[in-house]
Amino acid sequence: MPKLKTNSGAKKRFALTGTGKIKRKHAFKSHILTKKTKKQKRNLTYFSTVHKVDENAVKQLLCLR
């Protein structure tokens, strides 16, 4: 069986933490920022984790399953 290829879009967007959770960036932070408050923009800056429901799908894209 050939080697599995990692999805190149997924490898740019997701990263694994030390505990095995998957880190992701928030959406809505690239343009149309004038109408968003400072607080909204600040909170969108931080990383978040992928929800448990989506974890298996992302792991499959990253060839971790």
UniProtKB/Swiss-Prot annotation:
It holds the Pfam family Ribosomal_L35p. PROSITE patterns: RIBOSOMAL_L35. Keywords: Ribonucleoprotein, Ribosomal protein. GO terms for cellular component: cytosolic large ribosomal subunit. Coiled coil: none annotated. GO terms for molecular function: structural constituent of ribosome. One of its GO terms (biological process) is translation. PANTHER family: 54S RIBOSOMAL PROTEIN BL35M, LARGE RIBOSOMAL SUBUNIT PROTEIN BL35M. HAMAP family: Ribosomal_bL35. Belongs to the bacterial ribosomal protein bL35 family. This is Large ribosomal subunit protein bL35. It comes from Porphyromonas gingivalis (strain ATCC BAA-308 / W83).
